[in-house]
Amino acid sequence: VRVGSLFSGIGGFDLGLERAGMEIVWQVENEPYCIRVLEKHWPNVRRYGDIKEIDWSKVERPDLVCGGFPCPAVSQAARGRNTGEWFWPEFARALGDLQPDYAIVENVEGLLRERMAEVVGDLASM
């Protein structure tokens, strides 16, 4: 199974999926520290930076897309405050354009209360 990793961070999803026998074919991350960690552990994997700038028609279609998009808009720590960007639309754009066979979407519990209908609606329409 060929995997594309969104919001890769330091590669937790990637490592687990790789240990399960899957192949990481690309990663999306724009935090410098995280990129250094990814480069050390996956030196031959293609990396992309700002997810908003990616033209998905030029990216290899994986079998599986995984990721945990940044969650300040729905995190308990930010409850009641509009903090940070809402990155689900970028995750959905990637899924819609790439049409992988599988997707793993991870996020905080607050997503269930705050915006789960939007996420499920987008997934159902794909």
What kind of feature is each model-predicted range?
Residues 1-126:
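Conserved active-site and SAM-binding loop architecture
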